[in-house]
């Protein structure tokens, strides 16, 4: 069941949690969880593939882990998101994505986003060969979500064989806008 507060699907969390532990180390991860309220730490640590984990808990985990390892929380989250997305799209998906047109590749975003986040919506506009604009429709989207969507979009394009990918993210009244360009 989806959370009433903004949340991320457990299948994504279980994958990301493994990447986070690999990145910061198990000791740092466990130390970070002890800094959180017990209910939040348990919710994150015990999340399974069918759960929905509130974004606020994920942000708290990122901040606590960053404090433990002496890093910036958003930069650490970016690294974990990039590696997690790269692994997710780099598996069997890579072979399928390479034979997908630019337009078809960009239109996968709303489906992936809708299965990942409990709130918000993504609307791509295919502008032509090698360009697209992605609109995140979520006025109060947390910074973690805004950044992660840009990173995941870049990794999706890279898995599809696109090169020289550039994504410029701007906060907008209704959420965020991502201006994307690439070469095949």
Regions found by a protein language model. Name each.
Residues 118-120, 161-163, 174:
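Short beta-strand or tight-loop elements
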Residues 47-148, 169:
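Amphipathic interaction/junction segments at domain boundaries or subunit interfaces
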């Amino acid at each position: 069941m989806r959370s009433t507060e903004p949340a991320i699907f457990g299948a994504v969390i279980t994958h990301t949690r493994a990447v986070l532990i690999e990145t910061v180390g198990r000791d740092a991860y466990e130390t970070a969880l002890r800094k959180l309220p017990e209910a939040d730490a348990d919710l994150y640590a015990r999340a399974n593939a069918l759960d929905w984990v509130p974004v606020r808990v994920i942000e708290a985990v990122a901040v606590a882990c960053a404090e433990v390892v002496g890093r910036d929380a958003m930069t650490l989250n970016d690294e974990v998101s990039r590696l997690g997305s790269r692994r997710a799209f780099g598996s069997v998906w890579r072979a399928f994505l390479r034979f997908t047109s630019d337009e078809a590749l960009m239109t996968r975003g709303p489906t992936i986003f809708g299965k990942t986040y409990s709130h918000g919506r993504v609307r791509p506009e295919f502008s032509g060969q090698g360009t697209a604009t992605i609109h995140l429709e979520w006025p109060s989207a947390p910074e973690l979500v805004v950044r992660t969507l840009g990173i995941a979009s870049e990794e999706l394009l890279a898995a599809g064989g696109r090169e020289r990918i550039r994504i410029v993210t701007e906060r907008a009244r209704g959420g965020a806008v991502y201006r994307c360009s690439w070469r095949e």
